[in-house]
């Protein structure tokens, strides 16, 4: 724990720094501050009261203060608290993450004649040392995957699904079929519990490539209308889903019959011939391979930056991210990989450790990318910001955002879009040649 002081003509501030970026601060204000706050408080109260013999807002100050002393005092304390927080945010080099990061604030004294003091407890932005670029360990880029004939044939099979005959059948499901599933969660034995959909009419291909062995075993050789009820033993999953009974329903078993691709079908896809379609498909697969290489390089750069340096992180952000990732990983294991309760219990500790490590990496990168963005002198154009705002808007509202979107929502979209672009540009800078990262810390 370390203690430091900051001061100007109006305020003096003492802070004590603790682990987890937790800071306790004492803000002392001289009488000029409380006198100004008192004057503003009196003005605010006066304009809202009517006294006999005076027009609204025109009553003498001494009468208003005498009759409405409680309201004046409340407004004085509110204004003084705000002024103290603004001073803390402007003068101190351990600024609060946001107003919401303030855990507690208490006015110790507040007097127009003698000044006042406020105690704050809050989480601050982390202190990040200079980045040792010479220690950056970034592997060489992997070569772009070459597209094989097998890749091309598999691509053609996927294209053929466009022309496939999809026939609902009454026979039991078999390898290669698609099934439509709905999954609901409810509370076992609770007559007032209304089943809640986790998903409805979701299609799955019965194959080793698209299903885990246990999931496939549940829905192989079953017919339309088949139901699987499964109790949830894990207390974590019960808590996440607010229920303890999963009900799968097979809505349909669908037989897929894909034709052989030929010139005629290729022309329906805007190709001149089957060979021309193969050429276009190869170009598409090559572009996908380049994108995969780019994503791998991006991921390597994230890892390299996260491992470059350690520093203290805000504990609430770390805790929130860890809780979110723990939930995602446990639910993914239970509902996507279809682990049993016993299998989930065996994997739980490893999944939680993984979530903890991933959370720390994510929060570190949140602040490190901002530092890289600043040190590298990166920028965001108006066109880039507008494009990313459109992306964020579609994610939140779908294709048709509301016409009466509020200014607050617009500001939120701007902040989210800017954060995403800051992160992406910083990581892409890391993924460039190492020598380009030799910067002088600001």
Curated annotation (Swiss-Prot):
It is an enzyme of class 5 (isomerase). Gene3D superfamilies: 3.10.50.40, Trigger factor ribosome-binding domain, Trigger factor, C-terminal domain. Disulfide bonds: none annotated. Pfam families: Trigger_C (PF05698), Trigger_N (PF05697). Keywords: Cell cycle, Cell division, Chaperone, Cytoplasm, Isomerase, Rotamase. HAMAP family: Trigger_factor_Tig. Belongs to the FKBP-type PPIase family. Tig subfamily. This is Trigger factor.
């Amino acid at each position: 724990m370390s203690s430091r002081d900051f001061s100007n003509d109006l305020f003096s501030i003492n802070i004590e720094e603790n682990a987890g970026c937790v800071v306790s601060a004492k803000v002392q204000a001289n009488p000029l501050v409380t006198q100004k706050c008192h004057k503003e408080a009196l003005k605010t109260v006066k304009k809202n009261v009517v006294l006999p013999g005076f027009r609204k807002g025109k009553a003498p100050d001494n009468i208003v203060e005498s009759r409405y002393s409680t309201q004046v005092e409340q407004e004085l304390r509110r204004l003084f608290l705000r002024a103290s927080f603004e001073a803390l945010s402007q003068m101190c080099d351990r600024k609060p993450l946001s107003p919401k990061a303030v855990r507690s604030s208490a006015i110790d004294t507040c007097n127009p004649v003698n000044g006042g003091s406020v105690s704050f407890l809050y989480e601050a932005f982390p202190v990040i040392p200079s980045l040792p670029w010479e220690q950056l360990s970034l592997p060489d880029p992997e070569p772009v995957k070459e597209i094989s004939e097998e890749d091309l044939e598999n691509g053609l099979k996927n294209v053929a699904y466009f022309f496939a005959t999809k026939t609902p059948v009454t026979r039991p499901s078999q390898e290669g079929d698609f099934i439509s599933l709905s999954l609901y969660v409810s509370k076992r034995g609770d007559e007032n519990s209304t089943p809640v959909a986790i998903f409805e009419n979701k299609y799955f291909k019965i194959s080793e490539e698209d299903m885990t062995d246990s999931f496939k075993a549940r829905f192989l050789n079953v017919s339309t209308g088949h139901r699987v009820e499964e109790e949830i033993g894990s207390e974590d999953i019960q808590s996440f889903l607010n229920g303890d009974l999963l009900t799968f329903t097979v809505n349909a078993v669908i037989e897929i019959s894909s034709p052989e691709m030929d010139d005629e079908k290729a022309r329906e896809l805007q190709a001149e011939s089957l060979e021309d379609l193969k050429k276009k498909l190869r170009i598409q697969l090559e572009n996908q391979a380049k994108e995969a290489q780019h994503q791998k390089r991006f991921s390597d750069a994230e890892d390299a930056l996260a491992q470059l340096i350690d520093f203290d992180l805000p504990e609430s952000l770390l805790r929130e991210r860890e809780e979110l990732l723990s939930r995602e990983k446990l639910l993914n294991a239970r509902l996507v990989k279809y682990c049993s309760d016993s299998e989930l219990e065996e994997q739980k500790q490893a999944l939680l450790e993984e979530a903890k490590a991933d959370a720390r990496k994510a929060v570190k990168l949140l602040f490190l990318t901002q530092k890289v963005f600043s040190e590298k002198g990166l920028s965001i154009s108006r066109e880039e910001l507008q494009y990313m705002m459109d992306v964020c808007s579609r994610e939140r509202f779908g294709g048709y955002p509301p016409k009466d979107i509020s200014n607050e929502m617009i500001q939120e979209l701007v902040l989210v879009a800017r954060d995403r672009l800051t992160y992406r540009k910083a990581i892409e800078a890391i993924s460039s040649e190492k020598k380009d990262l030799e910067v002088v810390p600001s």
